[in-house]
Swiss-Prot record:
Species the sequence originates in: Beutenbergia cavernae (strain ATCC BAA-8 / DSM 12333 / CCUG 43141 / JCM 11478 / NBRC 16432 / NCIMB 13614 / HKI 0122)
GO molecular function: rRNA binding; structural constituent of ribosome
HAMAP family cross-referenced by the UniProt entry: Ribosomal_uL22_B
Glycosyltransferase as UniProt keyword: no
Name of the featured protein: Large ribosomal subunit protein uL22
Length: 121
């Protein structure tokens, strides 16, 4: 069983968010939440919320299908960050000039799936 969660238009740069997402890819869902809870990066909180949402979505999906659900069996199957729209702002500089400031946004996607059994193919 697979479940997906997204956070769109998050005000964190995709480059910084990808650093966080790369640390949890392939880990168990519970382990990923634990790692993100103590990560110093600002994007870690948003990514943690997306992982928790994906686990909750998996629970709802299992309940709807009347299937046994164990959150310990969930693993981060896919996690990626896409670039969202960029907000363009201007900062006043000397001599009447202005520099452009790019405020980047991200779309964070996490897909959790059940861990493959050892004997299964």
């Amino acid at each position: 069983m697979e479940a997906k969660a997204q956070a769109r238009f998050v005000r964190v740069t995709p480059q910084k968010a990808r650093r966080v997402v790369d640390t949890i890819r392939g880990k168990g869902a519970a382990e990923a939440v634990a790692v993100l809870s103590f990560a110093p990066q600002a994007a870690a909180e948003t990514v943690r919320k997306v992982v928790e949402s994906a686990v909750a979505n998996a629970r709802v999906k299992a309940d709807t299908a009347s299937v046994r659900f164990d959150p310990a069996d969930l693993v981060i199957a896919e996690a990626y960050v896409d670039e969202g729209p960029t907000l363009k702002r201007f900062r006043p500089r000397a001599q009447g000039r202005a520099n452009q400031v790019l405020k980047r946004t991200s779309h964070i996607t996490v897909i959790v799936a059940e861990r493959q059994k050892e004997g299964a193919r």
